Structure formats: C-alpha cells, structure tokens
C-alpha cells in the first residue's frame, strides 16, 4: 500500500515538473499567438487544450497556457504576436 502511494505521488510530481506554462509560440513564424484581451479567452483556451495544456487565457494580447507538455514551443514573454 505504501509503495502504491509513493508511486502515485512521484507520478503527480513528475507531471507537475514537466508541464510548462507560457505563451503559445509558432517556431516557423517566430511569434506568439495573438488574441484580443478578455474576448479572446475562449479561443486561447481551445488552442491551449489542443496543444495538450490544461487551460488558456488571453494575456497582453497573446495566448498564455498552463500545463503544456514539455515538447510544446512556448515563450516566457508575449513578444511579437501573429494570427493562427
């Protein structure tokens, strides 16, 4: 029973450590995904979930995501924005 609890705890920690938070970044266009503050939250949430994140919102006119997989390209700052 203790082993099962330890394994579960480790898996939760690994998932937390490997999850990234940041702005969705298009490597090809070299820009972050553009949105309209507040009204763009639904689109950002949809795009973030499509990329494997837990949720997304519009922040500083760019889509910010929480819980993205480690392989998803992100930017820590909004920077130059582009349309999807």
UniProtKB/Swiss-Prot annotation:
User: Record keywords: Chloroplast included?
Assistant: no
- Read off the InterPro entries from this record: LCN-type_CS_alpha_beta_dom, Scorpion_toxin-like_sf, Scorpion_toxinL, Scorpion_toxinL/defensin
Q: List the disulfide bonds.
A: 31-82, 35-58, 44-63, 48-65
Q: Which UniProt keywords apply?
A: Cleavage on pair of basic residues, Disulfide bond, Ion channel impairing toxin, Neurotoxin, Secreted, Signal, Toxin, Voltage-gated sodium channel impairing toxin
The residues forming the signal peptide are: 1-19
Q: Where in the cell is it found?
A: Secreted
Gene Ontology MF term list: sodium channel inhibitor activity; toxin activity
Q: Fetch the Gene3D superfamilies from UniProt.
A: Knottin, scorpion toxin-like (3.30.30.10)
Domain LCN-type CS-alpha/beta span(s) in chain numbering? 20-83
Sequence intervals crossing the membrane: none
Query: What is one cellular component GO term in this UniProt entry?
Result: extracellular region
Query: SUPFAM superfamilies, from UniProt?
Result: Scorpion toxin-like
Disulfide bond in keyword set:
yes
- Expression tissues: Expressed by the venom gland.
Q: Name the Pfam families on file.
A: Toxin_3 (PF00537)
So what family is this one in?
Belongs to the long (4 C-C) scorpion toxin superfamily. Sodium channel inhibitor family. Beta subfamily.
What does the protein in this record do? Beta toxins bind voltage-independently at site-4 of sodium channels (Nav) and shift the voltage of activation toward more negative potentials thereby affecting sodium channel activation and promoting spontaneous and repetitive firing.
> Any notes on this protein's domains?
Has the structural arrangement of an alpha-helix connected to antiparallel beta-sheets by disulfide bonds (CS-alpha/beta).
User: What name is this protein filed under?
Assistant: Toxin Cex12
Q: Which organism is it from?
A: Centruroides exilicauda (Bark scorpion)
From the broadest rank down, the organism's phylogenetic lineage runs: Eukaryota, Metazoa, Ecdysozoa, Arthropoda, Chelicerata
């Amino acid at each position: 029973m203790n082993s099962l609890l330890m394994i579960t705890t480790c898996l939760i920690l690994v998932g937390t450590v490997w999850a990234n938070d940041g702005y969705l970044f298009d490597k090809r266009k070299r820009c972050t995904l553009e949105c309209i503050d507040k009204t763009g939250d639904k689109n950002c949430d949809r795009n973030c979930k499509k990329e494997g994140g837990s949720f997304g919102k519009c922040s500083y006119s760019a889509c910010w995501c929480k819980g993205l997989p480690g392989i998803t390209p992100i930017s820590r700052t909004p920077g130059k924005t582009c349309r999807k």
